[in-house]
Amino acid sequence: MLSRRSLFAVGGAALLLNGCAQVAPEGGPPLMDVIGSDPNLSSFRAALRSSGLASELFDRPGIYTVLAPTNLAWSGAPERIRNGDREGLLNLIAGGRLSLASIQARGGRIRMLGGIDVRVVGGTAESPRIQAARPGQAPSGTSASIIRANVMASNGVVHVVQGVLIPT
């Protein structure tokens, strides 16, 4: 007979595994192909290419999480970022494959390669609102909603966002 404690343990383990199970199959498309397949991410893709990050990061071994702004969101970003500013772009990329469930399990915090933190500050479980923060500080500056999460690639995951995160 199963005890209540055993049922909770099994349920918790199942939820944990579900958050980790969203991995692209071996040989699936790489991040740049996933980003390139969505015409609504073409401006972001062009900036990754012009900055050199597309080849520097995504054409080499490594797993990444990308917060990819839509073309509309990208058009509202500062010109330096739209033109391929590496620091601004690195603030949209994190190391590791972080599904939405993984982000939520980490308390809604992600450290980006550019050194900023991104935190969940509201929204819903399916479409959280995120905001940038300088390390050790409260979130500030622009925020964005994740409008399509967990787009898996062989070398990471893409979350499509309606904004470009810039801490103030």
Show which residues each predicted segment covers:
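Mature, structured domains of secreted/extracytosolic soluble proteins
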Residues: 2, 8, 20-168
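Sec-dependent signal peptide hydrophobic core
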Residues: 11-12
